[in-house]
Structures are given as C-alpha cells and as structure tokens.
Amino acid sequence: MVSANQTASVTEFILLGLSAHPKLEKTFFVLILLMYLVILLGNGVLILMTVSNSHLHMPMYFFLGNLSFLDICYTTSSVPLILDSFLTPRKTISFSACAVQMFLSFAMGATECVLLSMMAFDRYVAICNPLRYPVVMSKAAYMPKAAGSWVAGSTASMVQTSLAMRLPFCGDNIINHFTCEILAVLKLACADISVNVISMGVTNVIFLGVPVLFISFSYVFIIATILRIPSAEGRKKAFSTCSAHLTVVVIFYGTILFMYGKPKSKDPLGADKQDLADKLISLFYGVVTPMLNPIIYSLRNKDVKAAVRDLIFQKCFA
C-alpha cells in the first residue's frame, strides 16, 4: 500500500492539450464553446420539458431527463477547463482538482452506462410486455432504478479515483491530454499499476460489458416483437419509440468501448499518433455525444417534437 505522503512530490499537473498545435487552439476554443452552449441549451430544454409537460411524465422521459442532467454535469466538469487551457500559456491543475475532475468525469460516464441499460429495459417492457408496463415501470420502480444508476456510477468512480490518487507521482507531471483523464494520469505513476489495470478491467466488464449485453438482448426481443406486428404502420410506430435510444446507445458505447476497452499500463515509445487519437476520441465522447443526444431525441421522437413545438408556441404567443 502506498502511503499518502509519497504523492507529495507532485502538487500539480500540467495538461498538454493541443500545446503542440497552438494555431488550432483558438479555432477549437470557438468550436467547443459553441458546442458547449448547444449542450446546455439542448439538454436544458429537454429537462424543462420532462418536468413541465404532463404528457412526458412517464418512465422513458424521466430517464431522458436524468440523461440530459448527466450530460450537463459531465461536460461542465471538463469543458470549462478545456476552454481555459486553450487561452492560458501554462496549463496547470492542482493535484486535488485533478482528483475531483477525474471522479466527476468517471462517475458521469459509468452512470450513463447503467442509465442507458435502464432505458433499454423500459423500452423492452413497453413493447414486449405492454400489459405489465404500468406495474413493472411504476413510479415506485423506475425512480429507484434511476437513483441506483447514480449510486453505482459514483461508487465505481470513487474506487478508481482513490486507487489512482494513492499512486506515487514522483517525476513527470505532464498529462498528455485535455483533462485529468484517468488512463492518461496512470501513465505518469512511478509504481506498479497492475492493481489499477485489473480494477479497471473489472469495472469495464461491469459497466461496459454487462450493460452492452443487457441492451443487446433487450433489443433482440424488441425487434423480434416488432417484426411480429402484422401492420407496417404498427411496426413503424413501435420502432419509432426506441429508435432514438438505439441511436444514442450506438454512438455512446461505440466511442467509450474504443476508448476504455483496453487500458494500457504504460505508453509505448513513439505513440504520438495514438496519443492524438486518444485525445480526439475523448473529445468526441466528452463534447459531441452530449450535444447529439438532445438533437437525436428531438428529431426521432414525436412526443419530444410535439413538446418542443408546444414550448415554442407558449413562449412566442403567450
């Protein structure tokens, strides 16, 4: 066990970000700022609608409101720091601030994994067992499911962050990333990180593998049920209720599985291209995905589209 005072030699980290490409920093500052504003606006509107519109007081939209709030929390934990790093010559972050950011970003990511599987279960019950839906997805059932997602994600993040921050950082303090991303921080440790790698692998199985299998099996049954619907209009209507969620799942898990699926204990020599790819994938996962979520649900869900129209009408003609 590494004692806490062994980490005292490093009191701050330097975030490399796009320091090697200074001409791109201002361009990325404007681009990410605009995307962040879209995230706040789009997800904020979805939260407002799920709370204020009585037609959306259903489990599906309660989970959607949680997802939107989660996306706002996740981006707010990292985007302001990224924006500041684009304008600041010396891009530093304290040891404690790095730990907080690592905890928040990991917690939000793990929570979203569980939350998306809960949303898949909601669609499975609604389409495959509609008569039991009011009982299985009652308020007394779906609210604990959502709360459990947050608790599970936060617990996993606490474990991973604690393990990472107890490592000794006695030499290099330059993080080759935009933020305190946990894999980038582990590369700086001057001790054996096999426990961290094993722990990360177990967490990947629990929060990536299990939800992916759960969602996959849910959609196998959902699609099989939809195909048995005799009318084309009925099949179209049934699929429209889950197409937005399926699109979000593919984008989210496709990105996060690629980024976290194989944690590396040390950075290989001459891996500059890999580091750049990791940064871009992390940026896509951290900014683009939360921006797309409300757009996807607004375009592919008729109830959300109707609620948006009602909200605009009320604001413009009230």
UniProtKB/Swiss-Prot annotation:
Keywords: Cell membrane, Membrane, Olfaction, Sensory transduction, Transducer, Transmembrane, Transmembrane helix
GO cellular component: plasma membrane
Annotated CDD domains: 7tmA_OR13-like
Family designation: Belongs to the G-protein coupled receptor 1 family.
GO molecular function: G protein-coupled receptor activity; olfactory receptor activity
Xref: Gene3D superfamilies: Rhodopsin 7-helix transmembrane proteins
Localisation: Cell membrane
Gene: OR13C7
GO biological process: detection of chemical stimulus involved in sensory perception of smell
Residue spans, topological domain Cytoplasmic: 49-61, 122-181, 227-238, 290-318
Function of the protein: Odorant receptor.
UniProt topological domain (Extracellular) ranges: 1-27, 83-100, 203-205, 260-278
Membrane topology: Multi-pass membrane protein
TM spans (from-to): 28-48, 62-82, 101-121, 182-202, 206-226, 239-259, 279-289
A Pfam family reported for this protein in Swiss-Prot or TrEMBL: 7tm_4
Name of the protein in its database record: Olfactory receptor 13C7
